[in-house]
Amino acid sequence: MKVGIDFGTTTSTICRVTADGRIDTQGPIPSLAAYGNGKWYFGEDAEQRLAGEDRAIYPIRDVKLMLGKKSIRIGPNQLDPEEAVSKYLSYLAGRIAKGEVIEEAVIGTPVNVDMAHRQALLSAARKSGFKEVRLVYEPTSALAGAIDLSRLDERALVLVVDWGGGTLDVAVVRKDGDTLREIEVDGDVSDLGGSRMDDELVREVLQRDASLRSKVDAIDGGFDRLKQEIEGSKRNILEEGIDDETAEPWRTPSLWLRETIEVRPADVFDVIRRMADRARERIINFLHRARINPSEITHLLFAGGVCNSPIVQKAIGNEFRSARAVSTDQQPQLLTGYGAARLARSGFTVQLAAPFGVRQCDDSFCEMLPAGHGLAVGAYRVAEFMVTDVLAPEAVFDLGICRQINGESAMMSAPGDAFRSIDQLHIRAQSTPGENKANAGDLIRLFCGIDSTLAVTVYAESNLTADSVRKSLSGVPLAIRVGR
């Protein structure tokens, strides 16, 4: 069986490809775990446990953002986040697999999480019993879930805004035959997600009630547990269609606190507006860095739970008045999982969308990996660079992508408007600065490749100093070729 999964920070979706090619969807499902008395609880069961009186049940929120860390503190317990995610993915699979073996799982991943995060996610998924696990960027997966690729005009330039509980990811995508080609991608991890909105609402509630703050502070896991209840109040205010900011507070009896929690609609709308304004600024800055004028965007797709808000859609959409909204029957928060299932059904390959390499001080560009280079474990390309500056204690390599592909030569001009720097790599080039004379044998070798984590890894070694440096880079634009 094949599945597509959107493992979200606050909600998740799992979609099953049936034997006759249909896609069954379950979601949104709370991305919530709880742990207490040696037992795990997930999803709605975790919500119910946390709403009860037992204070020895501890919430595990936002565990997606903890992947890559060695341990997390949950109440008095130290737990492995990879184990928590593995158990949660098994729980998701159990809701839809009905005892069948999951042969392939396609899982969405935020654009800018690091390699350690993705390695931990892949490991957790395999521990859950998934035989083959593949990753795709969440916004492009959402686009695959929203459209029929055969009907997308190749002249269309689509901006995908995928805003969920933990991340704001954006991608500018163009269709190129049977390929979804990412022109540029970017992502914010944990700063603008819907979970941060809940943090601000919790602070608003606690600032108004000092006695409540004292109670929450005295309980292990109290802040996260209160945050869970306030998130529910926020969701109810939005789903009930309350649009009067002067309306009465939403009141929720809290059994574990023995208090009634009040959340004001005015606070909810104020927080959403502030976050929407920050998101709009980030998107405009992203397009500016990509040298894309907002007027060039022909289509706009909103994905993720936060984008359900009319306030968010209006704040961002006003910058793209000439763009057409991508129409879809799916809810915004279901698109990434549904798109992942579509990709699993049709088959796909992942390639670099643009050449990756090194820009040097004379603006020349040494291409390390060409556009179209596919994912392959252990398949590295090598380039050698002579050490020519005998006074410099270290060599500096500017790593990034070149948006222009001029001919077949590996050496090309990469001026500022064509090259986007992603990171720099520094390596010691001399044992004693200023005393060594450069010669033809003084070399720094760069090994470069991209693997199933979607991260480009660059490994540098100096034959003069025997130093070596390894760096992994996320956020490289990719091309998704649909079909087998």
Where are these predicted regions, by residue range?
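Gly/charged contiguous loops adjacent to phosphate- or pyrophosphate-bearing nucleotide/cofactor binding elements
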Residues: 47-60, 64-67, 74, 190-317, ...
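Phosphate/ATP-binding catalytic cores across multiple sugar-kinase/actin-like superfamilies
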Residues: 85-99, 139-150, 270-300, 309-315, ...
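Early-domain small/polar-rich strand-loop-helix modules and first-structured segments
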Residues: 1-72, 134, 188, 193, ...
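Conserved phosphate-binding catalytic cores of ATP/NTP-utilizing and phosphoryl-transfer enzymes
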Residues: 1, 134-161, 289, 334-349
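Acidic low-complexity intrinsically disordered segments
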Residues: 348-484
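Phosphate-binding loop and its immediate beta->loop->alpha context
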Residues: 18-128, 199-243, 405-407
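Gly/Thr-rich phosphate-binding beta-strand-loop-beta motif of the actin/hexokinase/Hsp70
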Residues: 1-23, 149-183, 442-462
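Conserved phosphate-binding/catalytic loops in two-lobed NTP-binding clefts
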Residues: 129-141, 313-339
